[in-house]
Amino acid sequence: MNLTSLQTFLTILETGSLVRAADKLNVTQSTVTARLKTLEEELGQVLINRQKSGATLTPAGAKLMRYAPAITGLWRQAKNETGLPAGLTSACSFGCERDLWHGAGRAFFHYATSTQPELAMSARQGSGRDLTDWIATGSLDIIVTFDAVARASQTLYPLPAEELILCSDRRNTPIIGDPNYIFVDHGAEYRRVHAEFYHDAGIARLNFDSAWWALQYLLENPGSAYLPRSLAQPYLDKAALFIVPDAPVFHRKKSLLASDQAVEKFHWLEKAIAQIQSHERPQHDRAPSQGQAGQ
């Protein structure tokens, strides 16, 4: 089977059309069409319905989809490991949302690299949607992300919920009524509980969908924002930021998601997860917890 054609098949499904697949693969649409035709001829089945509204799976395509991610993932692993330098026996591709790198992401990466000297590691940043797509297609072995749902041939490991605390560049900032309040979008459940608690606070003038961006802005400008504790803690420790007293502490679910192949292959994975869970135990002694999201 032509692995390039199979990867193209997966990219068509990921993007929803042959045109977008061509853009993502940086090839012409005719090349994408030719690769798909090659795969269909090899299998003797039509795999994708080509429609103006987009590409959809045929029954045969749905059956192939059960195996395609595993096939491409195994090939990628074989390719990576056969090219490893002497002394390295395996490779792990890891992905993490940027807002989680400072806590669970970095803790996992450090554990793997420090305890497994024969392991080659690569790290990749992406949105939650990108990461789940990449692990589904075999491009990644393990991811740390928010609000994950395990698909077939994947195992989900819940991690301690991420604490979201109200931080400010000033002491004694009001909980409600700060004209420089920055709204950070931490997901649908957070938006719901935030709206319940701050129902009479009005609409924030500044909005970010990245806690990292909000942090960088807050370090250079007056204001307040809900940030993940793991991200804000270094700046709290050196008094560059301050926790707003008595503000509710929200929570957001996060998880480590691994392909079943990775679970079987990396015998140290559960120890790494236990290390993260121990390192990120709830810190109720540092701030009151009055509101919750994703619990």
Which functions belong to the PLM regions below?
Residues L10-T28:
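Short helix-boundary/capping micro-motifs
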Residues E40-P59, R76:
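A short LG(V/I)-centered, amphipathic sequence patch enriched
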Residues E42-L43, L64-A86:
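Alpha-helical linker/hinge and terminal dimerization helices associated
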Residues T89-R151:
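Central regulatory/effector-binding core of bacterial HTH transcription factors
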Residues Q125-N180, L231:
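Acidic, Gly/Pro-rich loop/turn segments at junctions of secondary structure
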Residues S127-G128, F146, H199-F250:
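Hydrophobic hinge/microswitch elements
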Residues G177-R205, D209-A211, F266, E280:
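Secondary-structure junction motif
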Residues V244-G294:
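A late-sequence structural motif
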